[in-house]
């Protein structure tokens, strides 16, 4: 169960996004959409879900290494998160099985869709935490949703088109 103090997360997240928009004016529009969406959320107080092996094996070290505002924000809510391994529909496909074994995500803000409940409800925005274990490769993909990723710890190797880039803690990545 979250305490009332944890509700500061939304205000802190909005302040963080506002600072990022000032730092990188090219991302003013998607960050503005995030800030606007965070302005109309409702606290949910869900029961924590079961843990997963990747979370048990890697979350502690990832949090210990997390730095900057993204790390602070994550540490403030992590105890209430419920984690899930995605892409059950791809079970039996070797590359997706390898991904799922070392990857989990947890909704923080989002819709109440009958699956795992986020900590705050919003029908306008989804924000969550992603935990990707060492040497896990997330396959190339294309989708309609624009995504903002903040690297809290570790190193993210990111591909956009044919170009690869490497991002460390504190980096904001816009995936569109």
Q: For the regions a protein language model found, what residue spans apply to each?
A:
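A short, N-terminal "cap"/entry segment at the start of jelly-roll beta-barrel domains
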Residues: 3, 7-122
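Conserved short histidine dyad/triad with adjacent acidic residue
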Residues: 105-116, 125-143, 163-164, 176
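Hydrophobic/aromatic beta-strand elements that line small-molecule binding cavities or substrate pockets
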Residues: 130, 156, 171
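Short beta-strand segments in beta-sandwich/barrel cores
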Residues: 137-138, 147, 154-159
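Short acidic-glycine-tyrosine-enriched beta hairpin
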Residues: 124, 148-150, 161-176
């Amino acid at each position: 169960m979250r305490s009332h103090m944890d509700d500061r997360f939304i205000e802190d997240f909005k302040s963080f996004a506002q600072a990022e928009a000032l730092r990188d004016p090219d991302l003013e529009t998607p960050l503005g959409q995030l800030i606007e969406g965070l302005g109309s959320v409702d606290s949910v107080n869900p029961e924590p879900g079961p843990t997963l092996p990747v979370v048990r094996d890697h979350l502690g070290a990832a949090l210990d290494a997390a730095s900057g505002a993204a790390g602070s924000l994550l540490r403030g809510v992590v105890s209430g998160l419920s984690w899930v391994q995605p892409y059950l529909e791809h079970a039996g496909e070797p590359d997706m099985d390898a991904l799922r074994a070392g990857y989990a995500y947890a909704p923080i803000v989002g819709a109440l869709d009958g699956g795992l409940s986020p900590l705050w409800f919003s029908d306008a925005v989804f924000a969550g935490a992603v935990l990707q274990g060492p040497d896990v490769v997330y396959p190339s993909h294309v989708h309609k949703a624009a995504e903002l990723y903040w690297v809290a710890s570790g190193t993210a190797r990111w591909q956009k088109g044919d170009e690869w880039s490497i991002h460390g803690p504190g980096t904001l990545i816009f995936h569109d």
